[in-house]
Amino acid sequence: NLLTLNELEFGNEVVTMERFDLASMIHNMLRSMQVLFEQKDVKLVYDVQEPVYAWANEFKMEQVLNNYISNALNHVDGEKIIKITIQRQDGHVRAGVFNTGKPIPEEDVGRIWDKFYKVDKARTREYGGSGVGLSIVKAIMESMHQQYGVINYDNGVEFWFELDDKNEA
């Protein structure tokens, strides 16, 4: 993970962009992670059926989604729901990973993208988080000049990103 982060931060890697089906990629990832959802007794909500094409590096976007979903699994609480959404809007495809649980404290929201930053160190020790996942997301999304972020809700947190829409008009 650190090697990946260093390569991205120092721009040593050429990012190859391609048209790919984001909906199918997410579906396949979730299928391969199914046992993790079952172990934590998490209700997964993802009901995108049709292809949704985006323009990005598919391998890098798998890393982004893997980090978002892993974070959701590590922090899900309360109703134990993880909901993944895809929306097309204004020439972009926006994907979100929401988990029920405690919102991120406002004073920490701006720092969660920093390398090695951990909001709850005691909780992070429980699952062995290194604090580089979201900084990798930041580096990947910035290398592709795309938007990403986090939204706090009363009942949880949503991490999101946007990619260029490559669906037929």
Regions inferred by a protein language model and the residue ranges of each:
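Conserved catalytic submotifs in the C-terminal HATPase_c
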Residues: 16-20, 38, 43-53
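A residue-level detector for a conserved hydrophobic packing site
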Residues: 61-62
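Short helix-loop "hinge" at the ATP-lid/N-box region of the Bergerat-fold HATPase_c
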Residues: 72-73
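Short beta-strand/loop element within the Bergerat-fold HATPase_c
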Residues: 79-91
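Short conserved segment of the HATPase_c
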Residues: 104-118
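Short alpha-helical Gxxx[C/S/T] motif in the catalytic ATP-binding
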Residues: 128, 133, 137
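Glycine-rich ATP-binding loops of the HATPase_c
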Residues: 145-153
